Amino acid sequence: MIRTMFKSKIHRATVTHADLHYVGSVTVDLDLLDAADILPGELVSIVDVTNGARLETYTIAGERGSGVIGINGAAAHLVHVDDTVILITYAEMTTEEARTYEPRVVHVGKDNKILQLGNDPAEGHTPGLMRPPHALSNAAHLS
């Protein structure tokens, strides 16, 4: 059986620009893409923590070290400058692969600089964020 599983995310990034008149996509600092194992052109889900909007688009590599998270095209109707977003990717894998796969989680802080890298999708590294009630850590459910 092939399953669609969580592959990686850039957690709680801040949107640096949004422009309705650009070709649709999301521009992401190449350092963040590399850290999250997301390729230019890869499908991403964007969850807007600020307003609850969810959408899918593809990535465009942005300048390294710039911290850019730029919402381009029609998505700019839903996601705005200074919104907090989560960029998520998924991958298809066999059940056996899924049981051992370790996702990449990139926690960012001010100016979208990397704070911490991890592999637990429920682990929070932002002050005030907690693990969801009853959620097991990756290590606990894999053993």
UniProtKB/Swiss-Prot annotation:
CDD domains: Asp_decarbox. Pathway: Cofactor biosynthesis; (R)-pantothenate biosynthesis; beta-alanine from L-aspartate: step 1/1. InterPro entries: Asp_de-COase-like_dom_sf (IPR009010), Asp_decarbox (IPR003190). Gene3D superfamilies: 2.40.40.20. The keyword Ribonucleoprotein does not apply. It catalyses: L-aspartate + H(+) = beta-alanine + CO2. One of its GO terms (molecular function) is aspartate 1-decarboxylase activity. Residues 119-143 are annotated as: Disordered. It is an enzyme of class 4 (lyase). Catalyzes the pyruvoyl-dependent decarboxylation of aspartate to produce beta-alanine. This is Aspartate 1-decarboxylase 2. It comes from Paenarthrobacter aurescens (strain TC1). The lineage of its organism: Bacteria, Bacillati, Actinomycetota, Actinomycetes, Micrococcales. The gene is panD2.
